[in-house]
Amino acid sequence: MEIWMFTAPFKQGILKELAKCWRDYDGKKYCMGIEKGRGGFRHIQGRIKVSADTNYEIIERIGKRKTRTRKGYRMFDTLSKAGIHCQKTDQWTDYESKDGYYIMSDDTEEVRAQRFGHPTEEQEDVLRLLESNNDREITVWYDETGNVGKSWLTGHLWEKHKAHQVRLTGSAEGIVKDVCSKMDQERRPIVIIDIPRSGKWTPAIYEAIEVIKDGLIDDPRYSAHAMNIRGTKVMVMCNTKPKLDRLSKDRWIFYNAPVGADKG
């Protein structure tokens, strides 16, 4: 197996065109995204994993050349003539997905629909409220009935590399460890705590919210590696009411405030 990095000029429909090429010629795995370089130049950056003996066929298809050469021979030069520059690498990452406009070989139709879909007006309202939060506030999207798009929005923001979803554990330390581990892999501006209908607010959630918003977090599993994430937006999605006295009054900003709480 070989891994290749490639850069291609942007044109309408290029992602689908390249994806079809990778499928037709047995590309084992790929990730490619649209990026904007210096001066606003838009281009495609990607990686593909292929069997060594299929290299020439991929070159011929993308490079639109009819003259055969030995398999894999002068790959860089051939692709360059088609405006596609290629370089062999030993490393596979999904780095090309970082800007949120990308496709991968293991995508399903449902995943792509969520990634490229557009939030509803209500979801946009929630995001505007979240964006207005200061370094102490959290946004709580409370909805007693459900089915208003909270989980869809969580997935959308995750796919666009804008949010991490917290894995709820039985302790505040476990929640903070999870956030620290994910932020260490990739800094994202939003942390989402999605409390399922069968779940409930716990002391661990209140405590973790305060620690995350205060900014300094660490994961003792990795020699107390600490990082400062102050300014990260925190949104809690829930179907049950929180106990408002568990956090300072100035922390709470509600979308669809429950009875007894002031709406942000």
Language-model-derived ranges and their functions:
Residues 26-39:
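Short, glycine- and small/hydrophobic-rich beta-strand elements in well-ordered beta-sheets
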Residues 144-148:
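Walker A (P-loop) phosphate-binding loop of P-loop NTPases
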Residues 140, 190-194, 236:
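Structural motif
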Residues 2, 27-28, 42, 82, ...:
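Short glycine-/polar-rich loops that comprise or flank the Walker A/P-loop
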